[in-house]
């Protein structure tokens, strides 16, 4: 069983790579962003609350996010492993995830960090906004999201690095090239254990 996280700044390719890697490893990819967007589209109470934060480029509060992740990780399809994208983003969420996993006698195996230059990420996200019409992808909001990543989520990365779980991977390049780099990085972390 493989339990993994994929982290990285907005636009670094986490969602795309999560799908490719989960297919290769035969595990389920879980995206908190997809779950939030589905709730927003369905106008659920969670979705309406989340939308306010998402439109401003802010993180959805831990109280909402933690409950959603806990519920998702208790579903049947994660029993063979998972690749979680978009969570945890804060130290408090790391603690919550540790609690969720340890309650089931589990722990993380690998944390993948996709890296990319901020200016490249802004270009990618502005292009995505034009293609998809996402309201949370204008340049001001994009730069705010990048700043949030650097100030909050990078502390999460440091924590996992200290635990020997982190594999840093350059997220720039063709999808299959990045996927190959990720698979090699996963093998490297597993071999070091």
UniProtKB/Swiss-Prot annotation:
Recorded family membership: Belongs to the adenylate kinase family.
Annotated GO biological process: AMP salvage
Coiled coil: none
Region feature LID, mapped onto this chain: 127-137
Protein residues bound to ATP: 11-16, 128, 173
PROSITE patterns: ADENYLATE_KINASE
Protein name as annotated: Adenylate kinase
Source taxon at top rank: Bacteria
Keywords in alphabetical order: ATP-binding, Cytoplasm, Kinase, Nucleotide biosynthesis, Nucleotide-binding, Transferase
GO cellular component: cytoplasm
Residues that bind AMP: 32, 37, 58-60, 86-89, 93, 134, 145
Upper classification of the organism: Bacteria, Bacillati, Actinomycetota, Actinomycetes, Micrococcales
NCBIfam families registered for this protein in UniProt: PRK00279.1-3 (NF001381), PRK14527.1 (NF011100), PRK14528.1 (NF011101), PRK14531.1 (NF011104), PRK14532.1 (NF011105)
Keyword Transferase applies: yes
Pfam families in the cross-refs: ADK
Compartments reported by the entry: Cytoplasm
GO molecular function, one term: ATP binding
Catalysed transformations (reactions): AMP + ATP = 2 ADP
Domain notes: Consists of three domains, a large central CORE domain and two small peripheral domains, NMPbind and LID, which undergo movements during catalysis. The LID domain closes over the site of phosphoryl transfer upon ATP binding. Assembling and dissambling the active center during each catalytic cycle provides an effective means to prevent ATP hydrolysis.
